[in-house]
Amino acid sequence: MDGDLRGDTVHIGGDARQRFHDARGYGYPLGGNDIAVSLVEAAHLLFRGDLDSVDGMGFRAFLTDREAGFAARFLVYVDLRDRGFYLVPDRDPWWRDPGDGDFVVFPRGNTRRDGVVKHRVRVVDERTTLPVDGLSESVLAVVDEESEITYLDIAPETPTGETTLDRPTDVPGVLLDDRVLVWEPPQRLHNAGFYGQPLGGRAADHDALQLSLVEAAYLIDAGVLRLTDATIDDVRARGRLGEGEHFDCRLAVYRALRDAGAVPKTGFKFGADFRVYSAVSSVDDLGHSELLVRVITDTHVFSPGDLSLDVRLAHGVRKRMVFAATDDTDDTIRWLSVSRLTP
């Protein structure tokens, strides 16, 4: 059986509708028994030996005659078919509600007629740049230089928490280098709110709480903390001295997390900006943090390798990786959760 190349589709006659479309989900009907299939579907049919040729080209010639990026899409298509999924190109007329990805994947045992979507898949290679403003809810299929495929699930995130605290007010503190010290602090500030770290160990002769600059700036804004030797502008300036504008971005994200009832703490040892606990009632009964948050700007550009590295690190410590993209006013934060996926 042969196919005819018509632009970006291949037309197949004979018993193609019953054999390929009705039974196995390829292409769309043209009328009678004829169907049109996409180029990647045609390549798969050639690869399997179901088609003999397209315009006289066998599989090898057809594959090498395609545009840049086709090989990666073909590899992902083959992989998902081999995993037992039906899938179609993410465009009309294959799918009634086309998006900006490459494939619409249906649950095992389902076809497009069932109308249930399992994944929207976008295919990239490992050298593709990925602007954060171009990432949407989808599965990113990254094809590396050895043709292995990594699937990353990208989804919007809404951080929430259940931490409540009767916060004190007008607590005095002093600015010391890149932290703020609170002498004789209200115990609930750390014990129930998990703000700061106590100075010294159990044998310390002085009761003091160390606050990071981000924590201090947030607590000053909230009316909890009052500096006796500096202002909030001094705290911000000290933060910018070491981080530049990233300090303001981190502060905006910290504020959003705290205001949502979550508890962000430094994520330095995990290579992130914050580790986040959804609920803290006492530091003596502290569970594991659930999220790692990396703060970026809304103009950030990922490489697939860096994205995969962050996700693998979070997975290795049993956390989810979340990216918080701030705009130039720090008023709007876009949250994206990225995790590894096995289709």
Swiss-Prot record:
One of its GO terms (cellular component) is cytoplasm. It comes from the Archaea. The active site is at residues 277, 288, 319. PANTHER family: TRNA-SPLICING ENDONUCLEASE SUBUNIT SEN2. Gene3D superfamilies: 3.40.1350.10, tRNA intron endonuclease, N-terminal domain. Pfam families: tRNA_int_endo (PF01974), tRNA_int_endo_N (PF02778). Its EC number is 4.6.1.16. Homodimer. It comes from Halobacterium salinarum (strain ATCC 700922 / JCM 11081 / NRC-1) (Halobacterium halobium). SUPFAM superfamilies: tRNA-intron endonuclease catalytic domain-like (SSF53032), tRNA-intron endonuclease N-terminal domain-like (SSF55267). This is tRNA-splicing endonuclease. One of its GO terms (molecular function) is tRNA-intron endonuclease activity. It catalyses: pretRNA = a 3'-half-tRNA molecule with a 5'-OH end + a 5'-half-tRNA molecule with a 2',3'-cyclic phosphate end + an intron with a 2',3'-cyclic phosphate and a 5'-hydroxyl terminus. CDD domains: tRNA-intron_lyase_C. Endonuclease that removes tRNA introns. Cleaves pre-tRNA at the 5'- and 3'-splice sites to release the intron. The products are an intron and two tRNA half-molecules bearing 2',3' cyclic phosphate and 5'-OH termini. Recognizes a pseudosymmetric substrate in which 2 bulged loops of 3 bases are separated by a stem of 4 bp. Belongs to the tRNA-intron endonuclease family. Archaeal long subfamily. Keywords: Lyase, tRNA processing. One of its GO terms (biological process) is tRNA splicing, via endonucleolytic cleavage and ligation.
